[in-house]
Amino acid sequence: MTLLATTSIAAISLYAMLSTVYKSAQVFHARRTTISTTPAKDIETNPVPSVDVIVPCFNEDPIVLSECLASLAEQDYAGKLRIYVVDDGSKNRDAVVAQRAAYADDERFNFTILPKNVGKRKAIAAITQSSGDLILNVDSDTTIAPDVVSKLAHKMRDPAVGAAMGQMKASNQADTWLTRLIDMEYWLACNEERAAQARFGAVMCCCGPCAMYRRSAMLSLLDQYETQLYRGKPSDFGEDRHLTILMLSAGFRTEYVPSAIAATVVPDTMGVYLRQQLRWARSTFRDTLLALPVLPGLDRYLTLDAIGQNVGLLLLALSVLTGIGQFALTATLPWWTILVIGSMTLVRCSVAAYRARELRFLGFALHTLVNIFLLIPLKAYALCTLSNSDWLSRGSVAIAPTVGQQGATKMPGRATSEIAYSGE
């Protein structure tokens, strides 16, 4: 047996053992009830909080934006609700103007128009104009069920909770084989990974398309959130994970509400999907380092979660790489590696199909091939290019002052404001 074959067998065997422990614990905790640190009677007697919804948009499809705002207008919420739409220097600004006209008589809606693209973190600075107890961030390509605000706000009535997210689905699931695969990927990410983390009040990333934050907590973290640097350069993506980790660092709980359903548009071509995954991989690697000091204060499961995701990825990559080397040099297939990966894929897909009560999850086996031959090399590239903050889907954004700071002026208007920046 060659050194390559031995290494491949050892790596995949360690990967199998680690993944078995990690995934078993994940499924076990995902099925259990979240522990609340506040007595239920105290939560129920808290007043219904006011909610401000912030919708940052950039070059959004007019139909998609219209559907997003319509879903917000139809929210069934007993408390006060305001909606702030922030156009981040879109080239198709007519789409936003049309929506402004459509909701001109709805006092809940406020439209802010930025003259140039400044990035999502700066667009979310509309929080400084708002006054709600809670802030709900909704991406402009996302529609939410009528009860989402109510369900997330109910979870946030526990003062120990700083952030909460809903369950993500693909609104364009039926378009291509890739969108179907991504929809299943979202289900697993929400109902296994996030659900298990929420068991201990420590969801590590509240997904941006539908995430609610406590305004008082967010204001105290806003400067850190807006000015995140990596190796001396502004970090312009991964804002969801970064803000969540800041919440955990400040001592707040972060939660997952599976019954709060949000549907978002997902990539329907492989090129767009891989560019998205590259951005996410870079931000995940960056913020994993930021999260390390937080882990000792959380339940031990969260340490296992970090090890399972990162060390597991390294072991799988090593086994695949040495297996390919074995085949290239000796013309013999790494049968043990293939058998272990195939068996683990079958078990995982079967468990998902059983838990979701949907046979389509058996087809998620295709994701294993995508992961091995596309995502692992992409993540290796991301690890080697962590300093690159290019969005890949658009040009670099300008860094501008926060709304309301010196250098920003607000034009008169009841439901519309236009912010002009003096700096680059």
Curated annotation (Swiss-Prot):
Cellular compartment(s): Cell membrane
GO biological process terms held by the UniProt record: extracellular matrix assembly; hyaluronan biosynthetic process
Any Pfam family: Glycos_transf_2
Membrane topology: Peripheral membrane protein
InterPro entries xrefs: Chitooligosach_Synthase_NodC, Glyco_trans_2-like, Nucleotide-diphossugar_trans
Chief place where the protein resides: membrane
GO cellular component: plasma membrane
Enzyme Commission number, as recorded: 2.4.1.-
One term of GO molecular function: hyaluronan synthase activity
Keywords: Cell membrane, Glycosyltransferase, Membrane, Nodulation, Plasmid, Transferase
UniProt cross-references to CDD domains, sorted A to Z: CESA_like (cd06423)
Function noted in UniProt: Involved in the synthesis of Nod factor, a sulfated N-acyl-beta-1,4-tetrasaccharide of N-acetylglucosamine which initiates a series of events in the host plant species leading eventually to nodulation.
Stated family: Belongs to the NodC/HAS family.
PANTHER family for this protein: HYALURONAN SYNTHASE, MANNURONAN SYNTHASE
Name of the molecule in the record: N-acetylglucosaminyltransferase
Lineage of the species this protein comes from: Bacteria, Pseudomonadati, Pseudomonadota, Alphaproteobacteria, Hyphomicrobiales
